[in-house]
Curated annotation (Swiss-Prot):
This is Uncharacterized 55.3 kDa protein in gtrB 5'region. It is found in: Host membrane. It comes from the Viruses. It is a multi-pass membrane protein. The chain crosses the membrane at residues 9-29, 66-86, 98-118, 131-151, 159-179, 194-214, 259-279, 293-313, 322-342, 350-370. It comes from Salmonella phage P22. Keywords: Host membrane, Membrane, Transmembrane, Transmembrane helix. One of its GO terms (cellular component) is membrane.
Length: 485
């Protein structure tokens, strides 16, 4: 592919918007959950999650292990790779309108759930790469040729080996290519052949990945449990309903926040736009019923792939980072608005810019809240270390037990009420027996020798040696106990 002047302008605009959107992360990125361990030990460990290509990439760019913390370079590289991938499909979807293309494609990053993905100092690279490759894979397969199916299958194996949740992005961009062909009066037969080709590329790649990679590399009880498919028996329907309700509870955090009108407006705009697209197609086309049915199916599919195949997992991970599909859905809504109201570009751009502005304000609040919480955690660990030293029982005790969860930083107490999603985005590391509590302690030079005690302890009278308004501290047997108030 050759880049023309429009591609270069598009990349410049998109990167400019992306830098503004992620500016707090580019200037000061906190250590986000897994980052704690990787920055401390320098290990890889993605292969056990079924993500061997992530291991390979970081092994290569670090010339082996231990890997180093090069933040914010991984995030910057991830955004650049995403921009290059999007430039490959810009012309097909938007023609020469690189300004609207930039605004619409930014919805992938403006996805409020994607904030968690971008917050990782290491994974931000491979997660952005996974999204980028999934888009290219979908595009390559949507050109009916046997060789394209093979290439798409290889790319599918690649993006699944980086981050499996990007599968939903593949599917939603397939829907984008279909609606593009509907608008451009492509024949039903060509649309059907291209769609079948894209689906074939995904299926072949997925099963190859599942058999040759996931089946052989996924290890550890946590990873194995979360990769199991619901068994086909009497509880199948019940399991699917349970997953749908659980994901809806996660999704509803944005509908219950102060920015809810943004997401309702996008859905409303999608419905109106698809109606307009259908009416235009009916006026000019012979296959009226077929086009109508196709658009209805596209609408339902676009909503399904916010969650996608994860509803069929026995124990899916309910976390913002897996809802990458929401960014694809937001993009798809904007694309349909663009197609339905091509003669009103200025109004569409203003609407897209407004969504992006509100999303940027929300993301800045999230990044600052995550940073404030991490600073509080470091302060708590420092204070615990001082208490242990002052009380004099640290030299002969090697185990530490946490009971309860650290409080929110004072500046976060209001934001989690204003925006319920913040409760999911702001990690509270010191949380009972969570393994990252131990890693956080080991990052502090004064408490690095303590190991987390994950068995139950019985608190009896006299166990408490000291306390403050955040926690009580004392000893039970050979274990230091910290109980949060």
């Amino acid at each position: 592919m050759k880049f023309n002047s429009n591609d270069r302008i598009f990349i410049s605009i998109f990167l400019g918007l992306a830098i503004i959107y992620t500016f707090p992360l580019l200037t000061h990125q906190s250590f986000f959950v897994d980052d704690l361990g990787r920055s401390l030990y320098g290990g890889l460990g993605w292969s056990g999650n079924g993500r061997p290509l992530s291991d390979f990439i970081f092994y290569i760019i670090n010339f082996g292990t231990p890997i180093i913390d090069a933040s914010p370079l991984p995030l910057m590289l991830g955004i650049v790779i995403l921009a290059l991938a999007l430039s490959c499909i810009r012309e097909k979807l938007f023609g020469d309108d690189y300004i609207t293309a930039s605004l619409c494609f930014m919805m992938i990053l403006a996805n409020p759930f994607f904030i968690e993905n971008l917050s990782y100092r290491y994974d931000s690279l491979t997660m952005c790469m996974s999204v980028a490759i999934s888009i290219i894979s979908s595009y390559v397969a949507y050109q009916y040729k046997p060789i394209n199916i093979i290439i798409s299958s290889i790319l599918t194996i690649a993006f699944l080996s980086l981050y499996q949740a990007a599968l939903n992005t593949y599917a939603i961009f397939l829907l984008a290519f279909i609606i593009s062909d509907v608008v451009k009066k492509n024949s039903i037969s060509n649309i059907t052949k291209n769609t079948a080709s894209s689906v074939a590329g995904l299926i072949v790649g997925y099963f190859a990945y599942s058999y040759f990679i996931a089946k052989r590399l996924v290890t550890g009880s946590y990873n194995i449990e979360h990769s199991k498919i619901i068994e086909i028996n009497s509880s199948l329907f019940e399991g699917i309903i349970s997953n749908v309700l659980s994901f809806y509870r996660m999704f509803s955090t944005i509908l219950n926040g102060d920015n809810y009108l943004i997401y309702y407006s996008l859905f409303f705009a999608l419905i109106i736009s698809l109606i307009v697209i259908v009416l235009k197609a009916i006026k000019r086309d012979e296959n009226k019923k077929t086009k109508l049915l196709l658009v209805v199916l596209i609408l339902l599919a676009s909503m399904f792939f916010i969650i996608g195949p994860m509803i069929f997992l026995k124990s899916p991970i309910y976390a913002p980072r897996v809802l990458i599909g929401m960014g694809g859905f937001m993009f798809f809504c904007c694309l349909c608005v663009f197609y339905a109201f091509e003669d009103k570009q200025l109004i569409s751009r203003i609407y897209f810019s407004f969504i992006l502005l509100i999303s940027t304000i929300f993301s800045y609040g999230a990044y600052n809240a995550i940073n404030a919480q991490f600073q509080l955690e470091e302060s708590i660990v420092n204070r615990i270390s001082q208490d242990i030293d002052y009380l004099g029982f640290g030299r002969d005790k090697k185990n530490i037990k946490f009971i309860g969860t650290e409080p929110y930083a004072p500046i976060n107490e209001n934001i989690v009420i204003k925006h319920p999603l913040m409760r999911e985005l702001i990690p509270r590391i010191i949380n009972n027996d969570w393994m990252w509590s131990e890693v956080l302690m080991q990052r502090n030079v004064f408490s690095r020798n303590y190991r987390l005690y994950d068995k139950e302890v019985k608190l009896e009278n006299g166990w408490k040696k000291s306390g403050n308004n955040v926690y009580d501290i004392g000893v039970v047997g050979e274990t230091i106990v910290v109980r949060f108030n």
